[in-house]
Regions:
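Active-site-adjacent betaalpha module
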Residues: 2-122
Length: 122
């Protein structure tokens, strides 16, 4: 379950925030709505945002499109989002549909993790 306080909400150990890093909690599909993240990114004059997580066809899609609408260059590392099967497509098909068709070249740069890391070093 993806609810604060539940096991499914916990941050993977390899991605846990470092001391002093800011944490934003979202309560709706896009992380930009009423979380303070948008204001923080604007204050920091961020130009590029890397997006990863669950669920491809809900929260990730909303965040990618909202980030794009707010003027950010959006990076979605390959295999850094996932979802479940629905009544129309398998999770894999949904992933491929969004990452390979809907976002790529329109709203985001869907690139390899290695390329993402290189861009983050700039």
């Amino acid at each position: 379950e993806l609810t604060k306080g539940k096991a499914g909400f916990e941050i993977y150990d390899g991605f846990k925030p470092q001391p002093g890093e800011k944490i934003f909690t979202k309560t709706v599909n896009s992380c930009f709505k009423e979380s303070g993240l948008l204001e923080y990114l604007r204050e920091k004059q961020a130009k590029e945002v890397v997006i990863a997580g669950l669920m491809t066809d809900y929260c990730i899609d909303a965040t990618v499109k909202c980030g794009f609408e707010h003027g950010f260059s959006i990076i979605v590392p390959k295999h850094a989002n996932t979802t479940t099967d629905n009544e129309y497509m398998t999770g894999k098909q949904t992933y491929e549909y969004y990452n390979g068709f809907i976002w790529q070249g329109r709203y985001a740069h869907c690139i390899s993790p290695e390329e993402t890391i290189e861009r983050m070093k700039r």
